[in-house]
Amino acid sequence: AGEAHLEKLLGQAMRDPDRPEELTPEQARILGHVEQAMRAEFIFKRNKDYLVQAGKVIIVDEFTGRLMPGRRWSDGLHQAVEAKEGVTVQQDNVTYATITLQNYFRLYSKLAGMTGTALTEAEEFDKIYSLAVVAIPTNLEYQALRADSGLMEMEYKEDGQKFFYFARKEDPQTPALWRRKDFPDVVYRTEEAKLRALVMQILQRHCLGQPLLVGTTSVETSERVSDRLRADALQRLAQVMLIRAAWFEKNNRAEDGMAVPELQPLDAPLDKLSRNDLAKWLRDLGLSTNPAGEENLARLARVLGLPESAQTRLMEALQSGIKHNVLNAKKHDEESRIIADAGALGAVTIATNMAGRGVDIKLGGELAEEVLTAVNRVLRKAGHADPYDLTNEQRKAELLQIPESEQGIYQAECRLFLEEMEGAGRVKEAGGLHVVGSERHEARRIDNQLRGRAARQGDPGSSQFYLSLEDELMRRFGGQGVSDLMQ
């Protein structure tokens, strides 16, 4: 049917009726162009697979989330995408020879490598390259599990899940070093339900002062999550939360995750919900229409499980939105600044795979090099032999012993250093960096790399993935059948 429609459009036959299995070179060329045009139109998505910048189509690496300027898809696909986007169609690349990565690596007599996610691909390394994968203990485990370390591993439970930390043998109840808390995935039937739960998690932890890194699979998704953190979207979500909580309370029912026909109108996409309709729901339940009002604020805090001390941050978030940074291929030139702030108290960073590997997020925020240099000079002047070998905690302890009057021209830098260290302490008390994944990747190692941004070098930290049966990966592998069962 597709070829018949194409023949009608072009006014020429695409195959010889007597020998349909054979194609002329011209017919093969036209069918190839048509196939690439269909791929460009229906499979390759703007702000996911590529960006359009300065009149050019630039590929986005699906594994790293970074731009690949100068790279072009082959066989006319790049030209088809250029035609789709209305930019100048450039000459196609000519390929003289190709080789697979597997065969390329086999050209070497010696082959070795190192990565933090090799174990997930151990079978492939053995099968294709005859390479064994050896797991090297992390620095934390090496230090903690030595016989002379004075540390012991302790188990505890949180939300029904088992987690571990290292404590000194003389004080086993006080954690000295942490292992990351990987919470189980949460799966929702619709993307809308997932987005709401994701934003509620961000709002809750932001109000507690815990920094968050929200991982997304595309530029488009990162911008969609960013839109949900604006004040108007948060207020609308808060109204829905208030209505649901009040309805269940009024009808003496517990919220068990099952669909409630009476509340089904609230399941529509958030931007489609009428403010007037939400206001009517609230008034009928005897509530104020202002989600930031005193009574509503206290009710929202209970729904989110927040202490009274967090209500001020909750009110600020509802009134002004949640201040956050977005790191994607469009903002690659701001990467260092965004990453430097990602571990600050209450910071929220929404990022594509760019933040999933090779990124070290410091709790409390990154200390400027000039601040550390100034502190080291003060310590050296005070008689410390080599302050550059100290950890920041040790620098803090030493600096507190030096009066401000002896800090000379570096008083401001020393004060800033102590403030940053105090902020880092508060972040650790809040639970460290929490990583939230908005979708699973096709390659498990990319998910592991994202999780690995939290709880580095014994710092506290946690991770969790929020999924829906409408996610691309779920749709590809039978999510519709599970969705029908959930209904």
Placement of each model-derived feature along the sequence:
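Conserved P-loop NTPase motor core
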Residues: 1-487
